[in-house]
């Protein structure tokens, strides 16, 4: 009887908890909708006023005391602050005013800096929101930059990401470089993909890319590889010379491989000699990627080097060598030249790639030379 009573009581308690949870969720949804409506209403009310002030700053006019007080009142209340941040986020994509947001926000620097201590103690979600908005405001002050640098060491990966992203959005190259060195020395990591996205914000900046190239050797291996990966997407030609010099001196295999990949995507006439040398590297990964990259640097000298690599002991090196050769010189004469040699593995890999690239030519050659070809078991 006691067991039945216990089970019945537990069931009632379980149903009660579920019922209360459902009521709470519904209440929270309604409360959120009400808050959103209030923020939307405030956004409509203050939008024109904020935009007028920004346009005034754009024309090099100072804001009046009343205009500054108007915005300060907005910033001191939670809901109106949310509405304000939405407007600033929208205007940051407006070509007419986007570059003057930082000048406009300097008028309210004291209020923003006073909130740093409060948000430093908040949970990661609220802290992320505040940090993200610092990036929108684009204010470069010692207190703000110092706070963002401290946030790079936060336990939350989202806080770390938003901190680095905001430093990048503020746009001070020296502070961004300082942040990267700090992260490297303290082994602070964020997701690789978002790290490259942040670096890519500066892909058109000659000055910052030159600084990134200058400090590469000060950074840890992983960060170097990610930055070199990012370099592949920009068109700063001076990077080619710098990375070629680094390739000649670099001893770390991972870094070297990323530089070789860079030269596959970014043609540089001076690089082909070094790429040919890499076909004799002690690391098969380097030999394989160099063989693939040489497809973009094709010449008589490159072809002869790749023919030798068809005999490499590693299958991937042979595969990439055959692919590079046939991509540039898929002729019956060249194929027969390789097939007439004694190396069985060179013949096999060339036929394997040929079958995938040009099945018609493969069948012709196979039928014509069938008696001469001995495939390995």
PLM feature spans:
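Amphipathic alpha-helical scaffolding segments comprising HEAT/armadillo-like alpha-solenoid repeats
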Residues: 68-72, 105-120, 141-152, 173-184, ...
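N-terminal topogenic membrane-targeting module
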Residues: 24-120
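N-terminal signal-anchor transmembrane alpha helix of single-pass membrane proteins
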Residues: 1-40
